Amino acid sequence: MKVSYHGHSVVKIETNGKVILIDPFLTGNPKTDLKAEDVKVDAILLSHGHGDHVGDTVELAKKNNAVVVAPFELATFLSWQGVNTHPMHIGGSHEFDFGKVKFTQAFHGSSYIDEENKTITYTGMPAGILVTAEEKTLYHAGDTALFSDMKLIGELNNIDVAFLPIGDNFTMGPEDAVLAAKWVQAKTVVPMHYNTFPVIEQDPYQFVEKLQNCTGKVLEAGESITL
């Protein structure tokens, strides 16, 4: 399993001959190295409905005939836009041709905001995402606060790499993320969701220096690790 980071919360997984993107916020993302028009993808996994996570999903899914795996309400909302979706919910898992996906809890919001009409559409509960393929497991926490059931996520899953938000303000900050890393018991922890906007500026290297009993890895946009 090859895993690459592409700024903000964008993670690409290459496994079993398939390409999977998590939270593909590309257009308007100052920290990504990817251009939507150049991306080839087989499946898109979404943690929640905010614009900086749904991003280019509709365009990418239509262009590549990719399936979008998302919480039920968000999947339904996107299906109305002509996207091929697979709805799931927290606690549920499903075997796809690239591997197994399971949704976990995340403490955040989830909505689609229409600035022009000044409306907010509820898109279900936010989620974290577990992907297991080639006997390796990745945990993408989505946008979330620290919560004690992260201990359970760590106990139930042998996590090889965890992507944890550290930006603060909208998610947990670095101090809480250090505790989250301890609880999820991942072998490797990669910080995400930081420095995209001024309000979430953080030093990822200071964060990884504080980690214990795991390997902290700062990935620049386009860099990857192989599990």
UniProtKB/Swiss-Prot annotation:
Entry-linked Pfam families: Lactamase_B_2 (PF12706)
SMART domains linked: Lactamase_B (SM00849)
Gene Ontology terms, MF aspect: hydrolase activity
InterPro entries registered for this protein in UniProt: Metallo-B-lactamas, RibonucZ/Hydroxyglut_hydro, UPF0173, UPF0173_UPF0282_UlaG_hydrolase
Keywords noted in UniProt: Hydrolase
Entry-linked HAMAP family: UPF0173
Family, per entry: Belongs to the UPF0173 family.
Protein name: UPF0173 metal-dependent hydrolase BT9727_4343
Protein's organism: Bacillus thuringiensis subsp. konkukian (strain 97-27)
